[in-house]
């Protein structure tokens, strides 16, 4: 059932697979930190090819495990949540790109009352 329909912020964090935070992959460290800080959720996507500010092409070849492949972390949050998030990113990211955009979120969850108050 639809339980949320409204405006939120989509944060996209673009980093490299070889980026580290205290000897741990940056994406894993960010996920752990965001969970610990009480954020609603985050998803990590591993790319198969890409290039960044230096125009160096990074690709996945069959004979190599990786060439510093792109990693995308997506977070959907409130505006206040994004305000809490930015200082964490400032602390943990040394190189990368972060975008924030306004999105319409429609959330469905089982066993909850729908927005119109009627059960189907």
Ranges and model annotations:
Residues 1-120:
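Positively charged, small/polar-rich N-terminal and surface patches that mediate targeting and assembly
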């Amino acid at each position: 059932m639809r339980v949320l329909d409204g405006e939120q912020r989509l944060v996209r964090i673009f980093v490299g697979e070889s980026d580290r935070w205290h000897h741990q992959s940056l994406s894993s460290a960010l996920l752990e930190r965001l969970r610990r800080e009480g954020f609603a959720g985050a998803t990590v996507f591993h790319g198969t090819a890409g290039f960044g500010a230096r125009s160096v092409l990074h690709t996945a070849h069959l004979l190599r495990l990786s060439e510093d492949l792109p990693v995308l972390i997506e977070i959907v949050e409130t505006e206040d949540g994004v305000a809490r998030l930015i200082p964490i990113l400032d602390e943990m990211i040394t190189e990368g790109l972060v975008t924030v955009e306004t999105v319409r979120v429609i959330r469905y969850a089982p066993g909850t009352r729908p927005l119109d108050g009627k059960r189907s």
